[in-house]
């Protein structure tokens, strides 16, 4: 069975920015990939937080040029929230893959075994993160969109324009 592909249709400052297509490594980290896939489709309904378990309408709250673009906090929108489809947090699955190149999709966390819904897309190789963040996918189309998002980031992570997931779902 092929790994699932999901998408984000992004806006920057309210204007359409394009589509990011990501392949999820369900063959290597099935629980982590399933969490992200289901949060893209919204199929799990409402979570314990009372908010929909869905990335649609959420923002990329932290964007640091020459590092990464982070999103997935659909409960608070500021990097302090988020929720997995398994409950608030779930354990690290495996550290099979490294962070070797731009476009790597990894779980954001607050230390070991604290995965929720927050994720980041690397814009450069980040080998110092190996073994600390579960790699669960890769951008396969739309790195130009990721680079456009990166341009509205700052060294402290705030964005000069709102970066939003206008729509998202599963392609295959």
Swiss-Prot record:
* Activity regulation description: Binds cyclosporin A (CsA). CsA mediates some of its effects via an inhibitory action on PPIase.
UniProt entry tagged with the keyword rRNA processing: no
Where does it live in the cell?
Cytoplasm
Instruction: State the EC number(s).
Output: 5.2.1.8
Keywords assigned: Cytoplasm, Isomerase, Rotamase
Which GO CC terms are listed, alphabetically?
Answer: cytoplasm; cytosol
Q: Supply the Gene3D superfamilies for this chain.
A: Cyclophilin-like
Give a GO biological-process term. Answer: protein folding
What this protein catalyses is: [protein]-peptidylproline (omega=180) = [protein]-peptidylproline (omega=0)
Can you tell which superkingdom this protein's organism belongs to? Eukaryota
Q: List the molecular function annotations (GO) for this entry.
A: cyclosporin A binding; peptidyl-prolyl cis-trans isomerase activity
What residues does the PPIase cyclophilin-type domain cover?
Answer: 7-170
Q: InterPro entries from the xrefs?
A: Cyclophilin-like_dom_sf, Cyclophilin-type_PPIase, Cyclophilin-type_PPIase_CS, Cyclophilin-type_PPIase_dom
Pfam families from the entry?
Answer: Pro_isomerase
According to its UniProt record, which protein family does this protein belong to? Belongs to the cyclophilin-type PPIase family.
- Biological function: PPIases accelerate the folding of proteins. It catalyzes the cis-trans isomerization of proline imidic peptide bonds in oligopeptides.
Protein name per UniProt = Peptidyl-prolyl cis-trans isomerase
Originating organism: Zea mays
Organism lineage reads as:
Eukaryota, Viridiplantae, Streptophyta, Embryophyta, Tracheophyta
């Amino acid at each position: 069975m092929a790994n699932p592909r999901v998408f984000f249709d992004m806006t920057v400052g309210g204007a359409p920015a394009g589509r990011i297509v990501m392949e999820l490594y369900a063959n290597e980290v099935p629980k982590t990939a399933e969490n992200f896939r289901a949060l893209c489709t919204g199929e799990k309904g409402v979570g314990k937080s009372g908010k929909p378990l869905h990335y649609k309408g959420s923002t990329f709250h932290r964007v640091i040029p020459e590092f990464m673009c982070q999103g997935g906090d659909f409960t608070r929108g500021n990097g302090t929230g988020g929720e997995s489809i398994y409950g608030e947090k779930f354990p690290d699955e495996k550290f099979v893959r490294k962070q070797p190149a731009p476009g790597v999709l990894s779980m954001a966390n607050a230390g070991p075994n604290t995965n929720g819904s927050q994720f980041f897309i690397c814009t450069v190789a980040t080998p110092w993160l190996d073994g600390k963040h579960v790699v669960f996918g890769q951008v396969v189309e739309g790195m130009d969109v990721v680079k456009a998002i990166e341009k509205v980031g700052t060294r402290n992570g705030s964005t000069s324009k709102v970066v939003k997931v206008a729509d998202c779902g599963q392609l295959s």
